[in-house]
């Protein structure tokens, strides 16, 4: 005899069908909740780079913030928009400090040694993105540098969210870029249509 969810009896009129439907619904509920629980924090929050909460009022942030440490966004695209904005801020600060905009300098600021294994983070990003550690990168606002920087963002997502590189949502990265730099929308679309330029994935 099938074990039915509480409150449903197979002896009732149509009880067997009700039992089967209720069992399927319960199994689906358990499956969905397991998937939700197994998601990493960055994925649940639509915050792929795990940007911490601060006084910044991020565009696309959820009205109700239930995570005490990290920002929660409405969509993954808004999470990536914030990531692009942070990188642009880094570029501008590095310029004022006379520092080159490189993967090493970016990660040393993003994941300082006081809280992270910075060297391991850098090595992982370099391996995943195939970018040189001291290679000077173009500013995020310059669409010509999108190829390398989007690989950097994807690699950082892998580390922050525990994803395989092939599972990173590249479309959301592009959507986030367009939200961050709306004047570059058409240029990015043209860039993405260029097969020679898009081979980096």
Which residues are covered by each model-predicted region?
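Cell-wall polysaccharide-cleaving catalytic domain and substrate-binding groove, primarily
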Residues: 3-201
């Amino acid at each position: 005899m099938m074990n039915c969810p509480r409150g449903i009896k197979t002896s009732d009129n149509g009880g067997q069908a009700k039992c089967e439907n209720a069992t399927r619904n319960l199994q689906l509920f358990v499956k969905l909740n397991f998937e939700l629980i197994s998601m990493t924090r960055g994925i649940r929050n639509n915050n792929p780079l795990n940007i911490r909460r601060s006084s910044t009022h991020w565009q696309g942030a959820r009205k109700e913030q239930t995570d005490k440490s990290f920002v929660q966004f409405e969509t993954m695209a808004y999470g990536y928009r914030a990531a692009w904005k942070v990188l642009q801020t880094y570029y501008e600060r590095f310029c004022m400090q006379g520092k080159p905009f490189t993967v090493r300098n970016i990660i040393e600021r993003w994941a300082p040694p006081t809280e992270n294994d910075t060297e391991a983070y850098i090595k992982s990003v370099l391996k995943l993105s195939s970018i040189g550690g001291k290679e000077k990168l173009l500013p995020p606002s310059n669409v010509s540098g999108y190829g390398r920087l989007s690989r950097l963002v994807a690699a950082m997502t892998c580390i922050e969210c525990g994803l395989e590189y092939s599972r990173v949502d590249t479309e959301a990265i592009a959507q986030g870029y367009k939200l961050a730099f709306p004047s570059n929308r058409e240029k990015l679309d043209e860039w993405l249509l260029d097969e020679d330029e898009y081979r980096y994935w």
